[in-house]
């Protein structure tokens, strides 16, 4: 019996020692994580300036001296702790081109603002109940540069797109790549084409002065020109009250279905990111316009369920020599109901595409 009690006491002592050792090991691991800087917040991104210049002297093939510069930033902020994930992305760029000519020497070449944030609660591994909000617009006036008068085709808040939605987000990391797929059946979208009275009056006068100076072809002159109406017509912020009457508004509000997919991959000094965003409104085609609109058959102007707004962005960057960077950025857009004028002056719904390849000073972190 004495031997049994002695053995039992030894087992108890062994268990206590083992438990203390495990506790010490876990505490050491936690301390090591803390010392290694495993934090809830993570901030990374890419900023830079691309530039190019062309100089010509007695160049038989023709051309003009020009300088082009684009400043850009892609910033990403992530908070992830326990079951909470909060992610914010800010993408922006602005570019100007100087051309050696008397008229319109400075022309805007790029202009973009995109801010998106989403807050999620992880209810199952890699699955999040998420609230998402985003905004996109531009900084400065956009003009259609051509001979004579250059009409205004866009500005700050004309257009702008604001999205708010609630949905499910699947997030996964694998081999250096972060994947996200978000689907929301409860999504709101507000599209604006806003211009204040003072700015509207100013640019209406500019149009009339350009006509008086002979800069506008008389066959294309509109005596009732109004910039606000032009922009609201282009971006579809109006509503038909009957087959021939439009009620113009500063904004269009829609409720619908949205999808967003994203991939971000980093390998040493190489970075790739791409996002695809889709939205379709919960509404029908509307009533027949009986041919009163040359572009659309029905009153909802092709903005009905099954017709998707498309935004697809791709960004590639490679950093070398610590401060030099090669970048390629593309953006493809398609918005049903948005009319775009081509070189011949014809209006139609069109796929929009922008590609920028540059080399310049940049920094990734």
Q: What name fits each language-model region?
A:
Residues 184, 188-313, 317-319:
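Outer-membrane beta-barrel transmembrane domain signature
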Residues 1-38:
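Cleavable N-terminal export/targeting peptides
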Residues 351-365:
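Outer-membrane beta-barrel "beta-signal"
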Residues 57-63, 98-105, 149-155, 241-249, ...:
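Extracellular loop and loop/strand-boundary signature of outer-membrane beta-barrel proteins
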Residues 49-55, 81-83, 92-98, 135-141, ...:
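Transmembrane beta-strands of outer-membrane beta-barrel pores
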Residues 45-47, 88, 131-133, 166, ...:
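Membrane-embedded beta-strand positions of outer-membrane beta-barrel proteins
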Residues 38, 78-82, 120-126, 173-176, ...:
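Outer-membrane beta-barrel channels and translocator barrels
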Residues 75-81, 117, 121, 133, ...:
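Residue-level signature of outer-membrane beta-barrel architecture
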């Amino acid at each position: 019996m004495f031997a049994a009690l002695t053995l039992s006491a030894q087992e108890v002592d062994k268990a206590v020692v083992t438990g203390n050792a495990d506790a010490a090991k876990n505490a050491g691991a936690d301390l090591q994580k803390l010392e290694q800087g495993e934090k809830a917040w993570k901030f990374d991104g890419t900023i830079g300036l691309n530039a190019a210049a062309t100089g010509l002297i007695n160049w038989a093939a023709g051309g003009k001296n020009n300088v082009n510069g684009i400043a850009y930033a892609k910033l990403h902020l992530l908070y992830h702790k326990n079951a909470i994930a909060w992610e914010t992305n800010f993408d922006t760029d602005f570019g100007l081109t100087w051309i050696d000519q008397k008229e319109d020497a400075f022309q805007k070449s790029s202009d973009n603002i995109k801010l998106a944030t989403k807050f999620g609660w992880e209810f199952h591994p890699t699955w999040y109940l998420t609230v998402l909000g985003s905004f996109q617009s531009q900084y400065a006036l956009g003009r259609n540069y051509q001979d004579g008068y250059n009409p205004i085709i866009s500005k700050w808040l004309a257009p702008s797109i604001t999205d708010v939605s609630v949905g499910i987000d699947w997030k996964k990391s694998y081999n250096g790549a972060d994947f996200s797929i978000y689907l929301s059946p409860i999504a709101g979208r507000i599209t604006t084409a806003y211009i204040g009275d003072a700015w509207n009056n100013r640019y209406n006068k500019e149009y009339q002065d350009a006509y008086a100076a002979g800069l506008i072809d008389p066959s294309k002159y509109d005596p009732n020109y109004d910039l606000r109406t032009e922009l609201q017509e282009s971006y579809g912020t109006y509503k038909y009250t009957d087959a021939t009457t439009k009620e113009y508004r500063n904004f269009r509000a829609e409720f619908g279905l949205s999808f967003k997919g994203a991939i971000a991959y980093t390998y040493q000094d190489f970075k790739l990111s791409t996002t695809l965003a889709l939205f379709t409104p919960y509404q029908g085609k509307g009533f027949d316009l009986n041919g009163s609109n040359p572009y659309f058959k029905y009153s909802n102007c092709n903005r009905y369920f099954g017709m998707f707004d498309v935004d697809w962005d791709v960004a590639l960057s490679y950093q070398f020599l610590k401060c030099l960077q090669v970048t390629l950025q593309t953006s493809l857009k398609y918005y049903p109901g948005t009319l775009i004028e081509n070189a011949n002056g014809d209006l139609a719904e069109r796929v929009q595409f922008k590609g920028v390849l540059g080399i310049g000073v940049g920094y990734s972190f």
